[in-house]
Curated annotation (Swiss-Prot):
It comes from Buchnera aphidicola subsp. Acyrthosiphon pisum (strain Tuc7). Catalyzes the hydrolysis of 6-phosphogluconolactone to 6-phosphogluconate. Pathway: Carbohydrate degradation; pentose phosphate pathway; D-ribulose 5-phosphate from D-glucose 6-phosphate (oxidative stage): step 2/3. One of its GO terms (molecular function) is 6-phosphogluconolactonase activity. It is an enzyme of class 3 (hydrolase). SUPFAM superfamilies: Putative isomerase YbhE. This is 6-phosphogluconolactonase. One of its GO terms (biological process) is pentose-phosphate shunt, oxidative branch. GO terms for cellular component: cytosol. Belongs to the cycloisomerase 2 family. Keywords: Carbohydrate metabolism, Glucose metabolism, Hydrolase.
Length: 334
């Protein structure tokens, strides 16, 4: 299966498209201008569409992905603020846009061609709304408020309207700054990375008396035995096998590997690796064979091979990219 890598370069105002070979060798095949600075990108695989959040004109550009991975611009959709995170519901009928600077989460229907329409709901006063992601098993949207040290929970109705759950808020540690979120493949466990205190929270989601509950079961540092004052954590991802989790910090320029306990799904720190300067974004391919980290300040990205047995990373190569790479995605072409 052919794989391509998309890199969003904010200051260069472009998206680069790279081929990724099984060996880990990569080559640039396309560079497409974005008519503005770019931040989040995301893909709906079954539609072969890529969505990019653009500012300062605050819009989402929809691109089609052809059989070779090349992008072609299809549409522009206005949004009411700067996009920081883009995600979708399970059926890919609605697009969720988080805005850290404008403090909101918006819901936009996708038409039959996958084009975002005007938002049908905007929830304001979510201070520092940095990310929002849907738990498909429980039909709950987790909306992260970095500045409030909390996570809001919403059910998604059939009509695309968000409504608060019974337990409508999760509190993280004070001044922790929750930033990004991922789910275990079984969807029963949640991992959130805290930008400001250098920790990861592990949450368990379950039903009790037919009511969905979420409880914190672990808080662990991204760096073993280094409890320092300054952290600047950014991204977090898990392998599709559910055995390994990775998290990075921009202050220390590291990416850490955790093993996931197969009995309780808590994290066990394994190792940290020095990586590119200011690692803002990284991604893992669907086969769990490669991990790529983009250095926002170094204007480079590094590709690692992943050990199937331990999750350890082995450097393969470093490539130069555009100015300020802020988002990276690995996409398997159908």
């Amino acid at each position: 299966m052919k794989q391509v890598v998309y890199i969003a370069n904010s200051e260069s105002k472009n998206i680069e498209v790279w081929n990724l070979c099984k060996s880990g060798k990569m080559n640039l095949i396309q560079k497409i201008e974005t008519d503005g600075k770019i931040q989040p990108i995301n893909i709906i695989q079954k539609r072969n569409l890529l969505y990019a959040g653009i500012f300062p004109d605050n819009k989402i550009i929809t691109y089609s992905i052809n059989h070779n991975g090349f992008l072609e611009k299809k549409n522009e959709s206005n949004i009411p603020g700067k996009a920081n995170y883009i995600s979708f519901d399970k059926k890919k009928e609605f697009l969720f846009c988080s805005s850290y600077h404008s403090n909101f989460i918006s819901v936009s229907p996708l038409n039959k061609f996958g084009i975002p329409q005007n938002p049908i709901q905007i929830i304001y006063n979510i201070e520092g709304c940095h990310a929002a992601k849907m738990n498909y098993k429980y039909n709950i949207l987790f909306v992260i408020s970095l500045k409030e040290d909390c996570i809001y929970l919403y059910y998604l109705t059939d009509f695309g309207i968000l409504k608060s759950t019974e337990q409508n808020i999760l509190h993280t540690q004070k001044k922790s700054g929750p930033r990004h979120i991922i789910f275990h493949p079984n969807q029963d466990f949640i991992y959130t990375i805290n930008e400001l205190n250098g920790t990861i929270d592990v949450w368990k989601i379950y039903k009790k008396n037919n009511v969905i509950k979420v409880k914190n079961i672990q808080n662990i540092h991204v760096l073993k035995n280094r409890f320092l004052k300054d952290y600047w954590c950014s991204d977090i991802h898990i392998t599709s096998c559910g055995r390994f989790l990775y998290a990075c910090d921009r202050f220390f320029n590291i990416i850490s590997l955790f093993h996931i306990n197969q009995n309780d799904n808590k994290l066990v720190f394994f190792k940290s690796y020095d990586t590119e300067e200011q690692p803002r974004s990284f991604n893992i391919n669907s086969h769990n064979t490669h991990l790529i980290v983009a250095g926002e300040k170094s204007n480079t990205f590094i590709i690692y091979g992943i050990s199937n047995s331990t999750g350890e990373l082995k450097k393969i190569n470093v490539y130069s990219t555009g100015q300020r790479p802020v988002w990276i995605l690995i996409h398997a072409l159908c």
